């Protein structure tokens, strides 16, 4: 069998590793357009800080980081600068992956011809065609940024080096917030505006409860609640957290550094946090969250101004954020950060679409075509999800895991549900997921869920339920009992007791729902 992996970033590398564990090396080749395995996030400027922690954003098969929290909030728990690229370099070296990668090769077209996948590849300006039995498409959504249509102001996606200018950053995602924070630094002497069409949901990197990364308060007990309950209760808790963050710090003290903001700046930060939340579309866990929360400090210190959308395609005049006043800005430059789009349709002549992939990773008609890294988490990280997808898809290809019958019908139904659930997100371009709910779905089909029976120890199972949620908790060949025993639980006991009581109170309702589903199913089948 001839297998091609397209892309050698985080998704491509972990897919290549699992393929080499399963198939002869002579069957596999990986194509990478660049000359590096560091991926799109591997070489960041020195002051860059990731939004997910090192602990949660690592491969289960290559564990480098624990869930220890540093004494001060200096971002040691997060990837800084080029650290994630260093991690990918080390991963590739450890598993001898580079010898299976052809660097400097770009995919220009793929199609199914005569029982195989025909790839049009380009290297040093020369094109060649190669045919494979199976394709793992691992380029994700970072291959082509969405464009900004402006007829009046020059635009760019290259922002480093911009100084002494009036700048408008277009976009409300984490990258846009990060760019705005960077350009608003005093040493750059810019006048900076962040243009938003709606509100955004901002989640703190460090939580006021115990001052730990927010990732470390997200455990399986919390995630076990029905999504509708989490949406309703979570919405109210987030408002409480914003309004009364100082109270939470007092209740659950920590030694972390406090923000160097005066009372007026703190109040302005809080005001904008609430305003952005109020204007955000969709329910709490149905829209993407922004964990680049540093930009709120820049807003509080009046180094960054949040405005509304442009009035027309000239991009010289804008609404204010409340869209009650017109602002004439005439910026020197627009910085594009309006998200990314997939090139699947362009590369396949419109034949391959995201909606045709079961679980966002297995093509429903061609079970030898796979997507890795296209699922984007509402809260979470792509590399860990990519590893789960890689394990699942390699298992599907090898016959280890069996796909359900009537796959096309199941996927059509799942796609309609996904589009309805995430109504504010363009699901033709992005496959939105809740990280652990999605990974659990794959884990169930792989038979590696960390159930009490599978773990075999009540004490260890409780630690898995209460410690920071991680894809390293699945009961597979990488399952490490000793490492789990050493993990810490950061959620305060009083909150754990409250969550446990809520689960107990909900038992009768869950049983009633199960009985109703059993009764309804036969009638639907008739």
Question: Over which residues does each language-model region extend?
Answer:
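N-terminal glycine-rich dinucleotide-binding loop that anchors FAD/FMN and/or NAD(P) in oxidoreductases
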Residues: 44-69, 212-225
